[in-house]
Each structure stands twice: as C-alpha cells, then as structure tokens.
Amino acid sequence: MAKTDFLTADMTRRQFMKISGKSLAGLTLSASMLSLFGCSQKQVDSGAVATWALPQGLLVVNADLCTGCQRCEINCTLTNDGVCSSYISRVKIQRCLNLDGAGNGLLSGNDNCFVYFPDTCRQCEDPACGNACPQKAITTNEQGIRVVDTDKCIGCGACHEACPWHMPTVNPETGKSSKCIACGACVAGCPSGALSIVDWDAVTSAAQAAYMDL
C-alpha cells in the first residue's frame, strides 16, 4: 500500500475518528507527531502503532512496548468493578496470547510467537452493539462515549455478538454488559508506556508545527 502524507497539514479530530482503532501502517507521520506519540516511523510502518479517538485526546497504542503483563486489564477492572478480572476488562490483552495458535483477529503473530496488542472499544459513530441491543441499553453520553445503562441491560450478549471486535462483555457475576468508558485507567496502569493518552491541544500543536516546517 502506498504511503499517505499524514499530519503534514491540517489534521482534524474528525479525521482521527475515521482511523480510530486502526493501525497507522501506510501513513507517514511528521517528526513532531512521531515525537508526540513516542514512536518511530519504522514502528508505524510495521503496524505496531494505532490510535483511538477519545473525548480527552488520542489513546496511542504501541504494540512494540507491550509486554503482555495485563496490568491495564487489572487497573481497568479494579477501577470500574472493584475486582481483578481479565475476562471483563474493557481493554483486552488476554485474548492476544495465541495459546491455541488461532490468532487474535487483529494480528496473526510473528514466527509463531505471542503478539501482544492492547485492544479496546472504537466508540463507533454507528455502533453495532447499540443497534443490536433489544433493550436500547447502550446510548451515547454528553462526551460522545457509548455507555451501557445497567438498569436496562438484561445481559443477553447481543452487543458482544454484534460488535465486530466483540468488545462489550457480559459480567457472569452481575449479568450485565460493560464496555470502555474512556476513563483512562488502563493508561494509568501501564508500566511500559505501551498505552498513552495525548490531549487534543498537543495533537493540534504538533500538526501545526508540521505544517510550519513544510
């Protein structure tokens, strides 16, 4: 795939939303944006770097820095559920372990080695999870985040099945579905820097710096 000149001119939040949850492979980032994301162009080219558009900024994932320690999952569930549980975590690492050799649906592995890639909700503009919910329990809050109304949720799992990435997860203890609410707990729990959130002002400044350097 031919590279696209990326972030060397105006880059809007809407444009980032179009590539939210996708690898940046095939895109050429400016030096200022590479510095902001804490990655190299080589890592971008390899598909190791992806971004998620959140209300507070960009969630940047660098798979090359992920050790698979699962602390992001632990911090997520401790913060939101008061328990340690990879299964109900809103950020997914445990399913990337490739224990059965089946892959994770995102990356096929490298020389039969494990490939760790933190994955989470894309906050889709037209969410399949919400559309599939028979109780209309998944709505959009004032920040633009898709949230589950646990009073309406019946734990049927329709949201999980409808999501192309199977992100919503029904808690077997509560019988309620949960999904990412962009709280940032996963980032706070990451010891390796594989997860980071870059605020929108910094993204805008880096894009403007790239434009000025042309």
Regions found by a protein language model. Give the residues of each.
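N-terminal export leaders
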Residues: 11-37
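Iron-sulfur cluster-binding cysteine motifs and their immediate structural context
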Residues: 42-44, 71-93, 126-154, 158-178, ...
